[in-house]
Amino acid sequence: MADELYLDTFREVRPAGSPLATLLLAHGSGAGMDSPFLEHLAVELARREIRTLRFDFPYMARARAEGKRRPPSPAPVLLTHWRQLVARWRAAESGPLWLAGKSMGGRMASLLADELGAAGLICLGYPFHPAGKPERLRTEHLATLATPTLIVQGERDALGNREEVAGYTLAPSIEVQWIATADHDLKPLKRSGLSQTEVLADTAAHIAAFVRTGG
């Protein structure tokens, strides 16, 4: 089992009993592993027998230490960090490992899921393109992705809304769960009658069901 030093790398949230699976959960570009979004989602997942290990990319850890915002590192740096964390996990633990991430974190995970032999992949608000630049697609690898993948996406996401995504070529391994009236942070409009807290609980339920069936 993992030692204390190993777990110091992560924010761990465990279910009361034996977990069905472990999710390595990465943050988006602007908010780190302790964001309310990821904290709440981790608690909801634990209630559904899913263990999460959240982590900060090095640029975010530096930003936290310095008390100021920093831009994300280049993709190769982020991908290297993902690889290192998965290697550390596999050296310390065994069992099904799922890669997961919000926005940028999910995109980086999607680039590595097949390479790393992940049991599955969860993307929360996948950034199909930069905001305001729908011509700059980040979808080429999604057409051939073999890893079972769940993308949870707001219908109004400015980085890939429902109408846009309908026109993309996605691999059969990918399932998209749409959140009505929600934005990139899965926050719905008031007229939906739902709060973001309720949406995150529903999202955790979708993830747990996907994990139970193995995607």
Tell where the protein language model's regions lie, with residue ranges.
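Gly/Ala-rich beta-loop-alpha elbow adjacent to hydrolase catalytic centers
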Residues: 101-105, 109
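Serine-hydrolase catalytic machinery in alpha/beta-hydrolase-like enzymes
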Residues: 2-96, 183-193
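Conserved alpha/beta-hydrolase "acid-adjacent" motif
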Residues: 158-164
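A conserved short beta-strand
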Residues: 117-132
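Catalytic active-site module of serine/aspartate enzymes centered on a nucleophile-bearing elbow/loop
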Residues: 182, 186, 190-215
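Hydrolases whose catalytic domains are alpha/beta-hydrolase-1, hotdog thioesterase
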Residues: 108-112, 132
